[in-house]
Amino acid sequence: MRIAALLLTLAIPAVVHADIVDIKWNDGMFSHKASIAPKKFLEVCGKQKKGDNVGWQFKGSAPSDFNIHYHVGKDVAYPENRKDVASADGTLSAPVDQDYCWMWSNRSVQAVDIEVNLKQAKPGK
């Protein structure tokens, strides 16, 4: 019985596993490469202040669902929300002081490789 309980305990994190990466800026730049397992997701998150502009670009080995979101109480706001895209780019102009997450959901049965690049810009640039 103990072995079964231990195996179940070890299996649970694999079932709910998702990658959440904290943005660590390096001279106003952030880059990250990851492989998203089938039916899992990747989030890249960091604090932004109202008026901050972040240029973003990503490329995937296959399409995934992509969004940029932040939480307001129990609600979720989506400044960007795209379905079934393999690459995209744009600029987030932060509407409020908040933690923002760039998120990719892999709904396929194959792993998807993602490469993302973020660049901080001064407001108005």
Which residues does each PLM region occupy?
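Cleavable N-terminal signal peptides
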Residues: A5-L6, V16
